[in-house]
Amino acid sequence: MSLLSDLKILLTPIGIPIEAGVFSDKAPDQYLVFVPLVDTFNLEADNKPGVDVQEVRLSLYSKGSYTAAKNAIVRALLSSDITITARQYIGFDAESGYHHYNIDVAQYYEMEEN
């Protein structure tokens, strides 16, 4: 179970190109980059983790209006019970012409018994 793979499956139908870490090809007018933020275990009384918490930043880059894409992403995340922990407009980069908007998400995965 991986939040990165779950996000790719969930958001691919929206039609925005997706990469993990960095966009390696020539950047299109709008694209998403997934950046893993942290993987943590919740503290349990027996010191054995029962839940794996994974957090990822979704960075949306858009040369035009980003609001329709942002709203579609947020709707998809909320309908899949993925926790949105933060949303923030980062700014407009005049040199590249891209607006940059971040959405941070978290998902809790039950640990598998060995």
Per-region residue spans from a language model:
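Long, contiguous binding/interaction regions
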Residues: M1-E55, Y61-N114
